[in-house]
């Protein structure tokens, strides 16, 4: 808990001195305030005594023990002007009671000056870098340099704070954000197009096959057919080039099932006409198209074209597929026999 509070203070104020004296209260509570003050004063007295003995040997030899004690008492006031002693755990060997054998004339080592890395300067240096690759490389170099200049005193909990981590928000490049936004916009734009294109691909095959008849009105098709018939009568165009039923492919590729054949035979018997089987088949097919409720506009155009081009369809069918006539005759014969 204490370390977290010191960490927060060190981050908020990088120049604070709380880390230098973080262990002083713990040591005082452990040894007691009176014993600590007496021991520090005795250490300061011995330190000042050794310095004075080196500077003035003659005066030290002529002085008596009483004079030495009085000099020690008079120099106790120097401790108020000196810097506080480091009280880290690895310095606790000095806080041994005075009656122990380790109480030698060993002077107290001055505390090393601490080299602290300012987190704000590190963040400022990282924020000045331009690209993401260079920032990663420079951050690695700065971390290596920061390890090289680590302080000698390791007692502080503030040492080891990864202050360069506060510049990580700079690593999130704006280019990545722009690419993500562009991808989202492209997905939003392509989704309605795909939804519109799917029903177009799944449209009715009958409408796709009859696109020519659906695109043009019936009046236009009838006028075109009349013009072709006039050209055929004058001998300018051969009858082989005349498409039957306005290019309706379903008329020639109609599924030949037994039910359809029976329907054709029934229509032939009910009409009682002496026309050819192909002509009766065309008439029955046109009637079935007219009676169907779906695609009424397309069926009426197909029926009108059937009635106009009925004299020519037999020739076209015989020339295109000569086996169809024999097949129809055999099917009609089998239906009559049944």
Swiss-Prot record:
Descriptive protein name: Increasing suppression factor 1
UniProt organism field: Saccharomyces cerevisiae (strain ATCC 204508 / S288c) (Baker's yeast)
Keywords, alphabetical: Phosphoprotein
Entry-linked InterPro entries: Mbr1 (IPR031443)
Any Gene Ontology biological process: aerobic respiration
Polar residues: compositionally biased ranges: 307-316
Similarity comment: Belongs to the ISF1/MBR1 family.
Region (Disordered): 50-75, 267-322
Chain intervals with Low complexity compositional bias: 50-70, 267-306
Keyword Thylakoid: no
Factors inducing expression: Repressed by glucose. Cotranscribed with NAM7 in the absence of CYP1.
Presence of keyword Phosphoprotein: yes
Functional summary from the UniProt entry: Could influence the NAM7/UPF1 function, possibly at the level of mRNA turnover. Participates in mitochondrial biogenesis.
Modification Phosphoserine, positions: 119
């Amino acid at each position: 808990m204490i370390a977290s509070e010191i960490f927060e203070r060190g981050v908020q104020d990088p120049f604070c001195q709380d880390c230098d004296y973080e262990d002083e209260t713990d040591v005082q509570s452990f040894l007691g305030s009176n014993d600590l003050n007496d021991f520090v004063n005795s250490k300061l007295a011995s330190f000042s005594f050794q310095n004075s003995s080196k500077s003035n040997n003659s005066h030290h030899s002529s002085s008596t023990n009483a004079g030495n004690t009085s000099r020690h008492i008079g120099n106790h006031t120097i401790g108020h002007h000196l810097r506080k002693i480091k009280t880290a755990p690895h310095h606790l060997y000095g806080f041994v009671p005075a009656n122990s054998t380790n109480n030698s004339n060993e002077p107290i080592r001055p505390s090393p000056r601490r080299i602290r890395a300012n987190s704000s300067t590190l963040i400022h240096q990282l924020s000045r870098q331009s690209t993401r690759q260079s920032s990663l490389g420079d951050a690695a170099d700065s971390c290596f340099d920061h390890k090289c200049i680590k302080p000698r005193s390791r007692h502080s909990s503030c040492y080891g704070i990864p202050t360069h981590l506060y510049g990580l928000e700079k690593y999130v490049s704006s280019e990545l954000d722009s690419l993500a936004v562009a991808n989202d916009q492209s997905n939003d734009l392509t989704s309605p197009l795909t939804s519109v294109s799917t029903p177009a691909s799944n449209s009715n095959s009958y409408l796709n096959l009859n696109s020519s008849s659906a695109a043009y009105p019936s009046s236009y098709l009838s006028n075109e057919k009349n013009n072709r018939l006039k050209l055929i009568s004058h001998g300018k165009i051969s009858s082989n080039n005349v498409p039957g039923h306005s290019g309706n492919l379903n008329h020639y590729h109609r599924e030949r099932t037994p039910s359809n054949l029976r329907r054709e035979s029934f229509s032939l018997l009910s009409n009682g006409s002496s026309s050819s089987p192909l002509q009766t088949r065309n008439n029955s097919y046109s009637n079935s198209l007219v009676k169907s409720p779906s695609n009424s506009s397309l069926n009426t155009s197909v029926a009108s074209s059937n009635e106009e081009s009925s004299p020519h369809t037999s020739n076209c069918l015989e020339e295109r597929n000569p086996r169809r006539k024999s097949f129809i005759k055999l099917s009609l014969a089998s239906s009559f026999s049944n």
